[in-house]
Structure formats: C-alpha cells, structure tokens
Amino acid sequence: MAPNNCSHLNLDVDPFLSCNDTFNQSLSPPKMDNWFHPGFIYVIPAVYGLIIVIGLIGNITLIKIFCTVKSMRNVPNLFISSLALGDLLLLVTCAPVDASKYLADRWLFGRIGCKLIPFIQLTSVGVSVFTLTALSADRYKAIVRPMDIQASHALMKICLKAALIWIVSMLLAIPEAVFSDLHPFHVKDTNQTFISCAPYPHSNELHPKIHSMASFLVFYVIPLAIISVYYYFIARNLIQSAYNLPVEGNIHVKKQIESRKRLAKTVLVFVGLFAFCWLPNHVIYLYRSYHYSEVDTSMLHFVTSICARLLAFTNSCVNPFALYLLSKSFRKQFNTQLLCCQPGLMNRSHSTGRSTTCMTSFKSTNPSATFSLINRNICHEGYV
C-alpha cells in the first residue's frame, strides 16, 4: 500500500506543518502509483532521522557551551543560544511529525496535536528569523555605533530582548493554534475524501492566499529586508574604516576591526543559510495556495516538495557546524565538549578568552576624522 503522501498535492496548506492528514480510504492518487517507489517510505524518514540526530548533537552542544563556559557568555552568544533553542524545538516537534506521514496512513496526533504542533512550529520559525534580525542589529551597533554600547547590565538587557523575541513569536503563532483544525478535503479527480490538519477549510480559496502571503512577508521578506539594511551600513562603515586607517596603523585597532569583520561575517552566514534553506518551502507554499483548486500529482512536484521540506529542516542543524568552521574559540570548546579532549583545554580557554573592554582612539590621516572604537566582549576571538 502506498503511503499517505499528500505533500505532493496542492492541498498541503501549511508551510510549517506540511501535509498531515487522514485518508478516509487508504488510497493514493492513481497517477502517483505509476512512479512512486515503496522505498520512499523508508528512505525519506531515515533522512529526517539523520537531520534530527545531527541537529540535536550540534545545538545541544552549543547550548551546553554557553551554559557551562563563563567566558563564552557574551551578547552575540546569548542570541545564538536562543537561536539554537528554537532550532531544537523545531527538530523535536516538526521533523518527527513531518516524517510520520510517510510511515502511517492517518493523522496520529488528534485535534489537540493539530492545534498545538503548528503553534510550536511557527513559534520556532519566528524565533529563528527574529533572532537573526536582532543579531544583525547587534552587529550594526558594535561596528557602526560603538559609542552607543553600554557595558553595564548589557547581558541582562539582551536576555530580556531574547525573551521578548520568544513572546512575540508565540503571539504571532496564536492564530495558527486557534484556526488550525481537522478539515475535510475532497479530490475531484480521484473522488477521494480525507481529513487534513489545516489552518482553514477547503471551501474558501482566499484564505490560503492570505495565509501564504502573510507567512512569506512576516517570517521571510520583511526580516531579511531589515537585515539587508543593517548589513549595507555595516559594509559601508567597514570600507570607510579600512580607507581611513593610518598607514602605520595601530595593532589593537586593526585587531578589533578584524574581530568585528569576523563576527559580522558569521552572522551573515547564518542569515544566508536561513534565506537559502527556507526560500524553496515558501515558494512551493505560495504556488499551492495560488493553484488551490488544482491537484498536482506529478513526480516533479512531489520530489520538489520533499526536498524543500528537508532543506528547511536542515537549516536547524547547520548553524553549529557553520560556527565550528568560522570560530576558533567555538571549535576548541566544541571539541572539548563533544570529543572529550584533555581537561586542561577548558581551563586554558577560560584564561585566554576572558571578557574585556577595549577602547582605542587614534587620529586618521584625515585630521577631522577621529575614531573611538569601543565594544565589550569582542576583543578576544571567542564567539560561539
């Protein structure tokens, strides 16, 4: 018996929940039977399982480093730990639910699950994209407006900002929980009826268009547009700083500029990964929403949908490994936590990675330009 794979249909109406439904008849669309291979039933959940395991290892290790290594508890690392927590939430809720539809021909989580799971999943997506926006704002302040940084109670303020991101994300996800329900759907071509967990019934074609466009704007386009503005000013400031730096230079200023470049590059990599991994999922959701009355049973649509979903979940496990490649301090801590390196390594990292406040002023070759570079917790290379 072919599995319940309505993820290849346009009836998949939630970009974060995918298609979790119960066929009243254990049937697959006839067109699909011509090309669907039974091996998909096991291969696809296995890929989901691999993503979950890798993501759990990476994100749990990252959070453990932040909680146990005092020198790593700085402003950007707190945001990144919050990002890792959101990724963990997505991996332990959305990924197993998504994988279950290939192993069972019915919705396994009841009406309560139909309301709770979309809420949790949308909260996680909101935490991810809004935290990336906050990280970009933090890098903007550190590089473009360093004089605005207040060292006192900085970590406490960032904790409040991180908590506010979670609260806003949950508030935005409340409509998903309120309106999601088990709705009946009917496929005319195959004369099949099934029950689908969706945020609206099949009767109104306007609802999916509004829902898909709102999700695309709020959780993708608008945050990425804000991030782009921040990084435009960051890039402009770094270019100007490079031109205005005296020829003889100041070793401390050069190191600080290089450190800020590394931090900005790391956040930009996170943003790029998010944009790349989530764009296909949003595009397919928009396509389905604007072709709601049609049912696409083609192999191309089925495979593209699966790849888009897997790519979206992959985003929840790649950030720790991107950090591993970009940050020497995190790489040392990661090896210590995960690979059980010698105990002395942790102590050395504490002494060499101690937080300090650096202030350096110098005159550029332009007499009217004076730079005062102040930032907390970024003089060392330690950046998770």
Swiss-Prot record:
This is Gastrin-releasing peptide receptor. Detected in pancreas and brain. Detected in suprachaismatic nucleus neurons. Detected in neurons in the dorsal horn of the spinal cord. Detected in inhibitory GABAergic interneurons in the lateral nucleus of the amygdala. Detected in approximately 160 neurons of the pre-Botzinger complex. Within the pre-Botzinger complex, there is some overlap with neurons expressing Nmbr with some cells expressing only Grpr or Nmbr while some cells express both. Detected in cells throughout the cortex where it is coexpressed in most of these cells with vasointestinal peptide (VIP). The keyword Chloroplast does not apply. Keywords: Cell membrane, Disulfide bond, G-protein coupled receptor, Glycoprotein, Lipoprotein, Membrane, Palmitate, Phosphoprotein, Receptor, Transducer, Transmembrane, Transmembrane helix. Residues 64-77, 138-153, 236-265, 327-384 are cytoplasmic. Disulfide bonds join 114-197. The modification Phosphoserine is found at residue 351. It comes from Mus musculus (Mouse). The gene is Grpr.
